[in-house]
Structure formats: C-alpha cells, structure tokens
Amino acid sequence: MSPITILLIGIAMSTDAFAAAIGKGAAIGKPRLRDALYVAVIFGVIETATPIAGWLLGQIASHYIATFDHWIAFGLLSGLGIHMIVNGLKNNGNTCKDNADTHNRNSRWLPLAATALATSIDAAAIGISLAFLDIHISIVAAVIGLCTFTMVIFGVMLGRVLGTFVGNRAEIVGGIILIIVGSTILYEHLSNNG
C-alpha cells in the first residue's frame, strides 16, 4: 500500500473525530490550546489502538477467508464509507457527539474516551480489513493516530467558528475516501489475478 493511500486512510478515519471535536469546541465556547491538546491526546491514543485491535482479530480469521479477503476489505471499506456519508447527510448540523458534560471546560476523560471509542469503531474495521493485506499495521495505526490528533486540535479550536458547517461535510468526504480506497484494493487484486 502506498504512503498516499495510508495517509488517505488516516485522514478518512479522523473525520468522525474531527466532527466530534468541532462539537466539543463549539460547546466549550472559547477553547484554549490546552483544551484542544487534552481532547486530541485522548482521541489520538484510542484511534491508534483500535485499528491494531481490529488487525489482530483479522489475523486470527485470515487463514479461513484468504480466497475472498479482497472482497471483505472492499465490503468493509465501502460499507463504512457509505455509513459515514449517510451519517454526514442525516445529522443536519448535529456534530456534537460528546453528549456527556460538553459544557464543562474541564470535562473528565471518561466521557471523552467514550466519544473517542465511538468514533473509532470504523478504525477497528479498517484494521480487520488490513489484516488481509501485506502491510505493517503499526505504520497505518500511527498515521491514523497522528491524523486524528492533528484534526482534533483543529476541530476543537475551530469549533466555535465553524460549528456545524464543516463537521458533516468532513464525514462525507471521509466516506468517499474510504469507498475509493476499498475500490482500489478490489481492482488491484482482481487485475493482478485476472
């Protein structure tokens, strides 16, 4: 997998967290850099860990499904992409996914971790699909974590200004990227074996 593809996966996986961070920043009102870093560390760590967990699950099952693994990767990535697009279209401006104590500048880490975990389920599914490819999951997980960390900082800081306008659109763009990556994996496998 090319470095550009890995970066695109990292960006796509961080759009949910970006949308949640915009909501968090809007709820804080006037977030400080310290607030943004606090939220970004929690989201970044969880987004780094979940693809590794998914990859481990995929490795366990890989020898059972090796003949159609490219279809699984395509299905998971495309399904997640469609899900993200639908969520982005139906949220109607509700980007604040952190429903627990969003107005408290010093929110405890547990509600933030729960939100981060909820937005990282797709990263776990990516990890499962990557288990069927010849790729170093640590590199992909690190890129996903760094992209998430960076985008969450921007999301929190820009939350007050951007509000709902960017949040939903970021999720739609992330979904489109996942569909393209899934289609590319399927095309490459079919063209190499066909």
Curated annotation (Swiss-Prot):
Signal peptide: none annotated. It comes from the Bacteria. Pfam families: Mntp (PF02659). GO terms for cellular component: plasma membrane. Keywords: Cell inner membrane, Cell membrane, Ion transport, Manganese, Membrane, Transmembrane, Transmembrane helix, Transport. Probably functions as a manganese efflux pump. PANTHER family: MANGANESE EFFLUX PUMP MNTP-RELATED. This is Putative manganese efflux pump MntP. It comes from Xylella fastidiosa (strain 9a5c). The gene is mntP.
